Amino acid sequence: MKTSLPIVVLLTAVISGVHPNPTPKSCTVSEEDLTTIRNAIQKASRASLDDVNLDEDLIAKCPLLKTITASLKSVASEIATLKDTGISEEQVDELKQSYEQQVNEIVKSRDIFEKQSGGDVMKEQGAMINRMTELQVQVAQLQQQIGEQTSRMYDDMAELIFQRLAMNSTDSIRNYTAHMMEQKLHTLMTKLETNYRIFLGALRYLDHLGDQPLIDKVFDGILKRLDEMSLETNKERENGKYVLVNLLCWTVNNRFLTEKYRKKQLELFRIALKFYPKTGNKEANEADIRGRQFCDANFPVNVITWFAVSRAAEGWGLRGTL
């Protein structure tokens, strides 16, 4: 017995972890409109923002198409951004080819795009909602997959950059790095914060240099920056959380920072309370922290959610310092 399309959509969403948007009340695109939609999606496989376009009238007929278009634009933007990083053109081209192939597989889906015989209008509308929902799920799965691939590429790039620096660390490189950290610390940290994987990689590279005074200076500089950050804008608040969490990642089992951490513990706790003030929301805080950290350790979560939030707020009288 053939499994009905709504059941397939539901099972696909549950198994993959991709959740379709709430079912819209209507989706009145016609069978002829499907050809236009298919052609637009096929054109989007080029992974160029200029090629991701869908007629506003079609989106008005079926709101799910807005989500689908947004997902395709997100992927195109993600791939375009790779060109401005240190990732090789070959890797970017390979990713684009993979994306194009998978989009072309989606547009070949008979369940979604094959013309169906006419029938009751309400049944046809319900069937079209199911077809567009499946399309949304498939595009969302592809978006998630591309996101995971680009994330791995960034990880590999950051690791390679600092591995090469460590392997080829001459006196001139060490001296130049120390000079930049001494003279341009704020500017350098601000630039590194555009990619937190690279931010953490740069901090770990300092351990390779083994310059204790420089490591102390950078640690203090980051604390000062966190202290000065405003919580009034979402961008600044989000950036501060990423910086705090990955600063703690750098601290994990770091022989250069054992003493520094002891001395700055109360300051760290106060800053943790600044960015995570909802002390009773431990589970949500923990999930948020794990989503930001680029290390496998539990240390950032333990510090922020337990010591800095629970004990500091209740027993160490830090509330009044904020």
Curated annotation (Swiss-Prot):
Q: Which residues cross the membrane?
A: none
Any one GO CC term of the record? extracellular region
Q: What is the effect of changing R38S?
A: Reduces the interaction with cuticular protein Cp19
Cysteine-cysteine disulfides: C27-C62, C249-C295
UniProt PTM:
Proteolytically cleaved by human mast cell tryptase and chymase. Glycosylated.
Q: What happens when the gene is disrupted?
A: RNAi-mediated knockdown results in prolonged intradermal probing prior blood engorgement when mosquitoes are fed on human host. No significant effects on probing and feeding time when mosquitoes are fed on membrane-covered heparinized blood.
The source's domain of life comes to Eukaryota
Q: In which tissues is it expressed?
A: Female salivary gland (at protein level). Female saliva (at protein level).
Note whether Zinc-finger occurs among the keywords.
no
Give additional notes from the record.
Antibodies against the protein are found in the serum of individuals exposed to Aedes albopictus bites.
Q: What does the annotation say about its assembly with partners?
A: Monomer in solution. Interacts (via the N-terminal domain) with cuticular protein Cp19 (via the C-terminus).
Q: What is this protein called?
A: Labrum-interacting protein from saliva LIPS-2
UniProt source species: Aedes albopictus (Asian tiger mosquito)
- Lineage of this protein's species? Eukaryota, Metazoa, Ecdysozoa, Arthropoda, Hexapoda
